[in-house]
Amino acid sequence: MCDEFEKRQIELTYYTSAEKDPCFEQNYKYVKPEFIGEGNMAFVRLNMLSAGVVLMTTPGLQVYQLKRSKNVKHYSHVLHMPNDATTYRLFGLDYFDSVLLTGDYQKTDLQYLENARNITKKELVTVGCSYLDILAEKIKSIPEEDNHNFTVLVSPSWGSVGVLSKYGEKLLDPLAKTGWNIIIRPHPQSKKSEKEMLDRLEARYKDNANIVWDYERDNIYSLKKADIMISDFSGIIFDYTFLCDKPVIYVADYIDLRPYDAYDLGKELWQFETLKKMGIKLDENNFENIAEVIKNASDSKELSEQRKIAKETAWMNIGNAGKNIVDFMIQKEESLSKKEGK
């Protein structure tokens, strides 16, 4: 999106709470990045915005600390993952004026919540998924390995339902014994919230030459190397599936949806339903036989077809998300200015 504004020579103010945001490295002329601090410092700044159109990846507008500014004409939220739009905390998207989607399927549940809660209808526009567009280009440029060894990528979510925190050694010990290359890529939040657990596991496998821990910012190098992924319900499953088109093994667990918008839908989420169709379920009682499970996890025609359907459903307008987002923002600003007679 920033590249698109720069290409069109249109000025954009870009606020970030990441002091080392990659945007600062781009040397843009028209895009002006600014670090606004973290936590309350950032919220104070955001609550005093003055702009025609504000685009955010942060949910929860007008729910907790993040408030609408009277000097902003239009608040838009852009989804940054191709999974369900209702997996935010309660009322996560209720008070935005528009939501930019990765796939048309996300409209149905948002419209259901609007009707059920009797709230103002939002503009729901399918633009695509900008970060997947970028990763797709990057992953193409990574050369194939000359002497590739079979590689398993363990890439979980964080918290009590994440496979690392819940199962840890029970899963990793049998994997280590296979002799295959094992890449463990913890969720970024785990480094902050589950450091003790990670330190324990890293110490346990420090002498295993076939186990590598990946904390790099970009996940594409591990995704490219992996022949199969083991995860839970982490969103990275869809990154791997859509970018690499390879089989996925998932460890299912109960997820308490009560704190999330999804709970009010009263039905199974698209991402859970889809994972059952395109993934291979792994039960805890099969951990000891994980080598056999992986060997038998043949990439059937049916699984391949389900991955294709999922990609077509959740990642629309491939390669055009940045352009579509900028088009929307410019057109929205122009229409708002026209209404005010400017």
Map each language-model feature to its residues:
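C-terminal alpha-helical cap of glycosyltransferases
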Residues: 318-342
